Amino acid sequence: MTSATIPGLDTAPTNHQGLLSWVQEVAELTQPDRVVFADGSDEEFHRLSAQLVDAGTFTRLNDEKFPNSYLALSDPSDVARVESRTFICSEREIDAGPTNNWMNPSEMRTLMTDLYRGCMRGRTMYVVPFCMGPLGAEDPKLGVEITDSEYVVVSMKVMTRMGTAALEKMGQDGFFVKALHSVGAPLEDGQADVPWPCSDTKYITHFPETREIWSYGSGYGGNALLGKKCYSLRIASAMARDEGWLAEHMLILKLISPENKAYYIAAAFPSACGKTNLAMLQPTIPGWRAETLGDDIAWMRFGKDGRLYAVNPEFGFFGVAPGTNWKSNPNAMRTIAAGNTVFTNVALTDDGEVWWEGLEGDPQHLVDWKGNEWYFRETETTAAHPNSRYCTPMSQCPILAPEWDDPQGVPISAILFGGRRKTTVPLVTQARDWQHGVFIGATLGSEQTAAAEGKVGNVRRDPMAMLPFMGYNVGDYVQHWIDIGKNSDESKLPQVFFVNWFRRGEDHRFLWPGFGENSRVMKWIVDRIEHKAGGKTTPIGTVPTVEDLDLEGLDANPADVSEALAVNAQEWREELPLIEEWLQFIGEKLPTGIKDEFDALKERLRDAE
């Protein structure tokens, strides 16, 4: 079929010649049955969702409990980001660095072009214009995803500002990121489709210099919703390096004191370490309130006043379901319960609701994420996949900050880094200065989780929680953070802190209750910013004593809190070789500022008790 005979190509709702020629080129290569330009309307969402129900991809949920919501069950081989198949194809291998997979870009283009040839046969090719961040921004970051997955189109409406408004923003010649996606499952005449098409061959490829994303073979969230990690972190981090800003794997939280003063805090944690829970914090301290601006990604630019301002480029939440419940994150539950949600790989109850491990209730019978019968206390496997997800509109969140759609963003007072560590790392530490804060972030260690392939439980270094998401060399990335500090007024920069909610005692109990009680740590952070709270100087930074924290009304043993705050110099001396191994791995591009910080830490620990 030539492009001239592919229905839909000749009725494009745009005169953008660059877009039109790209769409035609892709259609000629992939050979879809038809081309549809997505408009982002509610009607389109309903129509495609109904189509997915008919295809067996979606199950419509109980409308009384989850209005306009659906459950999708993926192929068991397509359940998470595939870091081993994710590539940064920079022109030079050194620019991808040691943390990324690299292939020569011309070789990768040849290889993937062969995969794309005819790959949409029997399917509809959707052209999905979208904007990351508010449409009213001075420099809106636009993109177009071409995909053969209705699941992607529906999810992109939730996760991005998608459709006609984004297309109009592009005008006739505006720049956009080209994001090409196919599930890699062409259909021959008469061939029946499967509920979750995908391919055993998977590539998620980024070309940072040309700002392109090519994805093949996976229908799963992070591999297929190309506005998310692919654009908002991997491509955007390369843009940010070139343009002097930061694209980071961070939540954005607004804390409001009893005096009604607002503080905006950005926090970077690896996946499944409590980002969404902190983003939707429900403070337990009287008089304190919290609102959310985002749970996953922050773009930070300097304002005219010299402060760092953050926006959330996303439009929805794509949260890990297991462990989310009315105690751990009531605001996430309220957001989901408002409806318009796409669940993936959770379990289905007999009355058309969803369930996952950690959710209240003990259903006796379920259909699990693989579509099999599941019985309480009889079936040995989990009912929901550990990386199962909910995809839900941000606008439904009951504690959404009114500034969430402000193109100017919000001024950041503190940046938090955090990971999941049973030992060594105290509950909260304040960095000595910006460069020390960058060192803390660059050497962040966390026990591995189910959000990516790999062995659960291993501690891996995850700089700024960006290990899987840096679009260029890790050494250059860390140097960019240092340069952000050097090129600004340090008095206006956010204060940097490190938190660890997950420290355990010798009996393996969590020493800190976490969840809403984390507001007590946040209060100390705010009071440090205001120079109102005490703290103890330690070799790793300033750590509060038990007396420095507001523990009034806390149902916890002060001895446990003291242990959670402890800085054990011997444990840290044992940590030094692990940090050094990571710094050696970064290699020749390791910033001298980071080496200086490491040497200074060794010196401070040498004489510490």
UniProtKB/Swiss-Prot annotation:
BP GO annotations: cellular response to glucose stimulus; gluconeogenesis; glycerol biosynthetic process from pyruvate; oxaloacetate metabolic process; propionate catabolic process; response to lipid; response to starvation
Positions annotated to bind Mn(2+): K229, H249, D296
Cellular compartments annotated: Cytoplasm
Cofactor binding comment, as recorded: Binds 1 Mn(2+) ion per subunit.
Molecular function, one GO term: phosphoenolpyruvate carboxykinase (GTP) activity
Subunit structure: Monomer.
Protein name per its UniProtKB record: Phosphoenolpyruvate carboxykinase [GTP]
Origin species: Mycobacterium ulcerans (strain Agy99)
